[in-house]
């Protein structure tokens, strides 16, 4: 027998596990554990469970295990949602995207282990995983909105905010790519002091340019989200969905900037780096939700 409450718990579980997949990937990169299992995949150093287990191997194995569990739980969520609430227009496309990108994410990760891809390709891995996470996150939000306690179904987003939000999505995604590139090119401590080394502003090598590009994109992201937030609060003050959503996004980008700065100041403290990955994960999830609302608005115009 289908119960909405069970589906809600399943959605929350899937979202939490997908969050740990994101954090696990960041942990693997930050600790240099990419080669913890050698060039073996899905085995680890040629065995299901190798005898020698240094910390890098444990981290890589744990990430693979959580990724495998996430696939099972997401499939469970997708099948249950498709069967019971598939009449909701977004459920089936989101189901396909969540599973599809989860598989692509796994294949890119496997290719990185087996063939040692260059950092510019590896940087795509985090962005792909964020799309999968966001699909699961959106499904969970839709499941919770079934009881009609929210105003999202009757929300109409006008063109100015739609344009600002679409541009925000593009800018944030580019910033995410440059951030992943910083990790994969080992450029976290390049380009000197934060926000810029005033005594030596011009980047000198590829690592400096990667870090410089990410800081520049992060600055643009912060300014653009602030502009979008001000517009949303000013013009949609009577709508809780917009007010809370864009406020949450602005808070998340502030936290993202703070943890980014602290990462440089503390020489990439691991806990701060993981919070940096966590905040951008949920910021992207919020932007994905705004896109969902905008698509509903566009559909209502036809």
Swiss-Prot record:
The keyword Cell membrane applies. Residues 30-67, 115-125, 183-215, 266-270 are extracellular. Heme o binds at residues 63, 125. GO terms for cellular component: plasma membrane. It comes from the Bacteria. GO terms for biological process: heme A biosynthetic process. Its EC number is 1.17.99.9. GO terms for molecular function: metal ion binding; oxidoreductase activity, acting on NAD(P)H, heme protein as acceptor. The chain crosses the membrane at residues 9-29, 68-88, 94-114, 126-146, 162-182, 216-236, 245-265, 271-291. Keywords: Cell membrane, Disulfide bond, Heme biosynthesis, Iron, Membrane, Metal-binding, Oxidoreductase, Transmembrane, Transmembrane helix. Pathway: Porphyrin-containing compound metabolism; heme A biosynthesis; heme A from heme O: step 1/1. It is a multi-pass membrane protein. Disulfide bonds join 37-44. Its cofactor is heme b. The active site is at residue 60. Residues 1-8, 89-93, 147-161, 237-244, 292-302 are cytoplasmic. Its main location: membrane. The N-half (TM1-TM4) and C-half (TM5-TM8) domains are connected by an intracellular loop. Each domain is formed from four-helix bundles and they align in a pseudo twofold symmetry manner. The N-half domain is the substrate-heme O binding domain and the C-half domain is the cofactor heme B binding domain. The cysteines of disulfide bond Cys-37 and Cys-44 may be involved in transfer of reducing equivalents from quinol in the membrane to the active site of the enzyme. HAMAP family: HemeA_synth_type1. Catalyzes the conversion of heme O to heme A by two successive hydroxylations of the methyl group at C8. The first hydroxylation forms heme I, the second hydroxylation results in an unstable dihydroxymethyl group, which spontaneously dehydrates, resulting in the formyl group of heme A. This is Heme A synthase. The lineage of its organism: Bacteria, Bacillati, Bacillota, Bacilli, Bacillales. The gene is ctaA.
